[in-house]
Amino acid sequence: MKRLYILSLLIVLAACTTRPAQLRTGDLIFVGIPENYRIAGSMAEAISVSTNQDSLNIIHTAIADVRGDSVWIIDATIKHGVDRHPLDTFLNDFTLKDGSYPRFIVKRLKDNKDAERYVERARGYTGLGYNRCFVPCDTALYCTELVRDSYRRPDGSYIFSEAPMNFKAPDGTMPEYWTELFAILGMDVPQGIPGTNPRAMMEEECLKYVGPVSVLPQ
């Protein structure tokens, strides 16, 4: 009887042990920082304030490009523009001020059969600049704009939707960063113009949560 109990306990423990998932080509990596995390005067701060929900601010979206044992990241950032680089570069770019990592949330299309085609299209955008003004531009893309333009069906239609962009803080005020940035660009803040953002994209119905993956810090 005792032996049977121990065996049953071991089976239950084994069932409760979750193995890290494997990152696949086409997976989307969402970068989340603590709600109270601030980087004075940075775009990350402005994005986190304007997309603030729950206790985690989703500030960036990147595309995984897995080739054998090598993991590459395709994303659009101020530092690199639209670029394909090793995972280590991505992790280094998003290391927080105290040396820790943000939270990485991995999601995958529920219908992922065309992932290679989406990633191939994303690779074709490398070399473009970073779209700082967040309005359509032939020579630059911002992070979720890159994803939306890359993930299109065979007929050219978009998988991810657009919504009116919100640059305001939860209290309705406009962060100074955005006001100053767009003034330098000689334009008004494009509040309400159709676009995408990491938080809204992460919550799209076409995606499913993958869980912790072995190659990303937890």
What is each model feature region?
Residues 26-29:
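Loop/turn positions that initiate beta-strands
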Residues 46-47, 101-165:
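Active-site nucleophile-His-acid catalytic modules used for acyl/amide transfer and hydrolysis
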Residues 135-218:
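Activation targets extended, charge/polar-rich intrinsically disordered C-terminal tails
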Residues 1-4:
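Positively charged n-region of N-terminal signal peptides that target proteins for export
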Residues 33-104, 130-138:
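Glycine-rich catalytic cores of cysteine/serine-nucleophile enzymes that process amide/ester linkages
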Residues 6-9:
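Sec-dependent N-terminal signal peptides
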Residues 14-15:
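C-terminal motif of bacterial Sec signal peptides marking the signal peptidase cleavage site
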